[in-house]
């Protein structure tokens, strides 16, 4: 999952009133921030929060209209991309004010996001 899309995913799910799915995504985003090493956030993670995503070709899959190759992973997980911090903060902002959520963000969540912001600074 590319974190550069975090804000847009939250916005789209909110616009569709997909509150349950949005809350699950916000929980995933929360877990990314919680597990951030010293505030460092990768540009992308696996859906199960996997950090190492080496690119490899899946030869047994033909690809779209047989036009393969199909690849899994991306070496970008090794990169430092500063824009990702803003996308995470903007995406997570919904969890602080949306009263429809079962679990809204709290002071501990704010402190974790603050560390993310400091890392970007």
Predicted segments with their positions:
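Acidic, mature catalytic/reactive cores of soluble proteins
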Residues: 1-121
């Amino acid at each position: 999952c590319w974190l550069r899309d975090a804000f847009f995913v939250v916005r789209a799910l909110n616009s569709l009133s997909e509150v349950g799915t949005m809350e699950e995504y916000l929980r995933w985003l929360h877990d990314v921030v919680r597990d951030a090493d010293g505030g460092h956030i990768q540009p992308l993670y696996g859906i199960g929060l996997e950090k190492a995503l080496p690119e490899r070709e899946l030869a047994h899959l033909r690809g779209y209209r047989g036009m393969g190759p199909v690849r899994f992973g991306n070496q970008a997980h090794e990169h430092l991309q500063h824009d990702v911090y803003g996308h995470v903060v903007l995406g997570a902002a919904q969890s602080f004010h949306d009263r429809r959520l079962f679990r809204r963000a709290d002071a501990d969540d704010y402190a974790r996001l603050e560390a993310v912001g400091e890392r970007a600074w």
